[in-house]
């Protein structure tokens, strides 16, 4: 039996976790990060790689539909915060890439969305 209330609770936790980066009380989500800052942030994000002005990670799922459920949850979160990844769907794998096309590189918003993506990836049952 599928427990919708548990999924709903987990989704609420994930969606309400807007990671914001501030400096002197000022929102810095759309400021480009230095290579050093990006690499420092990625220490906490297991499996994420920084290369060619993007951060990316490939996730594996037990079933194709688990991966699609993850994509749907990620798409909703991206719409909510207006920061959208490039997503590549494979058989039981999903690759997620963040960059700011406007700024030409990785911003704090990219890192914040990578953190949110990590949380969403643990809700691996499709709905």
Question: Where do the model's predicted regions map?
Answer:
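N-terminal first-folded block
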Residues: 30-64
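Short arginine-rich
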Residues: 47-50, 75-85, 121-124
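Short amphipathic alpha-helices in soluble, non-transmembrane regions
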Residues: 70-74, 111-114
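Mid-chain, well-packed structural core segment of small domains
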Residues: 80-89, 95-99
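C-terminal structural segments of small proteins and small subunits
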Residues: 97-123
